[in-house]
Amino acid sequence: NNTFIIMPFETKMTSEQAIEKLKNLYGTEITTADIKAFCAMNDITYQTVTKKLQPFKVSKGKWNLEVTVEAVESIEKSFNSPAVIPASEKNLVPAVDATFLKFGNFPDVKKIIQSKQFYPTFITGLSGNGKTFGVEQACAQLGRELIRVNITIETDEDDLIGGFRLIDGNTVWHNGPVIEALERGAILLLDEIDLASNKILCLQPVLEGKGLFLKKIGRFVEPKNGFNIIATANTKGKGSEDGRFIGTNVLNEAFLERFPVTFEQAYPSVNNEIKLLRLHSASFGCHDDEFITKLVDWADIIRKTFYDGGIEELISTRRLVHIVRAYTIFKNKAKAIQVCINRFDDETKQSFMELYDKVDADFEMPETNESVEKL
């Protein structure tokens, strides 16, 4: 029979020596039961051993003696930011888009971002006119980091500020996008802010530029130089009177007052819109300047009629880009226009098609969906 001699545990034993003994007895993966047995054999307290093994703990009641201290630190560091890559290693500067054309309020928005001053900015305008894209490209041109948050009725403090997350049986604080932007000195873009509920009021102190106290963990976050907030919306925070933007809400007056400046974003002028569509057309591998010019003239007439109250729908710049792209795919004007305006009701769709027929003398008006399919 093999005889085992149990030696008294040396209280001055190093962590390396203790780990080596544990490996010899139980292997590299050990449990609470293994440690308790080891403590009983060596007349040592459970707390003393687990303290030595703290860097090797992988989950509750489990240790892996092959895990290095560096690996553990790397794992812990990865949970300090919303992504797996540590915040300091991420690049949040948007890419420059070759299809972008500056127009309207873009120079002013760019100046605000370039100043690195804390100057909350509210941008309002109809759908598809480049509000968000303009902010993104201003940051791209200036090399500024941008964190975009799409606001919904469900967005709350946990989504914006952060909260505790359950990781390997432990609760770990997880920064939200607002804290990330504060600490990085980035531009925080609150997209479609008029969809928010009253839970958005958790940003009141942030909109004053004074930082934010995280009451759940007792830490105050100072805003880094360059931090700013830009909000975009289809309304001015007073709801949608005509019902075009269902889901938008009336925002708190005190909240809106914290935005010192508001820009009203309009659709680009005819000349600018032609230039913009040419850029997109080139990126799609299509070159038909005549078609682009007719499309812009058509959209301009529709918008003027909309502003005068003659119709309830309009063609956005984004919709024109959709049509140009559809044209590069289907190689047919009628089909490209029709499939891109099918989202409107039949009466509106028919009136839009008839109007384009008047704008473009060479256009062949389709009679039915079936006839378009045959073209």
Question: Positions of the model-derived regions?
Answer:
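Short acidic, hydrophobic short linear motifs in intrinsically disordered regions
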Residues: T28-C39
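C-terminal regulatory/interaction module of P-loop NTP-utilizing enzymes
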Residues: A37-D43, T48-Q54, S59-K60, L65-L375
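Positively charged, polyanion-binding regions of nucleic-acid-associated proteins
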Residues: P8-I30
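Generic short N-terminal amphipathic or hydrophobic helices
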Residues: F4-I5, E29, S74
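N-terminal amphipathic/basic-hydrophobic helices that include classical n-h-c signal peptides
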Residues: N1-K12, T45
